[in-house]
A protein has these predicted regions:
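Extended, low-complexity segments enriched in Ser/Thr/Gly and acidic residues that occur primarily
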Residues: 1-116, 132, 141-150, 156, ...
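Ser/Thr/Pro-rich, low-complexity mucin-like regions
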Residues: 170-207
Length: 214
């Protein structure tokens, strides 16, 4: 006969939470001590956003979509995943489209915050700024570091759906952190083609505390 019980203890001197597992196996007690995984973050919400599908641009460095953690924000953002979806409606010239870290954001069209999906409706409202670029109202940013990129499809009817995943497989937390005043954008790396249709899907968490996962 085997009986298993759990004893929860307060954090030890190092601050780690300890759980003692007691097993009764054929009349013999066996004790196992395990550490419970904790995080230095206070999670405020996990969010999902799917952009409009916008037409391609012939302009090099044209920015289609951007998201920014406001400069006065008291939260951090952690990117979980980015999905790029690009369709070629006619024969088109292939180019690279990339995602970059940015440290400023102006221009473009503001996206209504109600279009951001809370993964749990009980989460707090998100604080991010999201904008879409157009030829008449282009987005301007300060480009910092290239995060990822892909080549566009060539033939009519071809499409690309590619996911860049930054989440930890165990707890789905990400260590790709965007502090106040930081964000990401999606842009042409060369002169593009109007026969592309482009959207992105982003998932992120907003939290208080430090970004390191322990």
């Amino acid at each position: 006969m085997s009986v298993e019980g759990y004893i929860g203890l307060p954090p030890d001197s190092s601050g780690k939470r300890v759980r003692t597992i007691v097993k009764q196996i054929e009349g013999e007690s066996r004790h196992h001590e395990v550490f419970c995984i904790t995080s230095p973050r206070t999670l405020l919400g996990v969010y999902h956003y799917c952009s409009s599908m916008v037409s391609g641009s012939t302009s090099a460095d044209f920015i289609y979509h951007a998201i920014l953690n406001p400069s006065d924000s008291d939260r951090n953002m952690a990117l979980r995943r980015i999905i790029l979806h690009i369709v070629s409606v006619k024969q088109a010239t292939p180019i690279e489209i990339a995602v970059w870290r940015i440290t400023s954001l102006s221009g473009g069209v503001d996206v209504d915050p109600s279009r951001i999906c809370k993964k749990d409706t009980n989460y707090a409202d998100p604080i991010v700024i999201i904008r879409e670029g157009s030829e008449t109202n282009p987005i301007s940013t300060t480009i910092e570091n290239k995060i990822c990129g892909t080549m566009t499809p060539i033939n009519a009817g071809q499409y690309l759906w590619i996911e860049f995943n930054f989440a930890n497989a165990v707890d789905q937390r990400s260590d790709f952190i965007l502090h106040a005043g930081e964000g990401i954008c999606m842009r042409n790396e060369q002169a593009g083609d109007v026969d592309f249709r482009i959207l992105w899907i982003i998932e992120w968490e907003e939290f208080k505390g430090i970004g390191v996962i322990t």
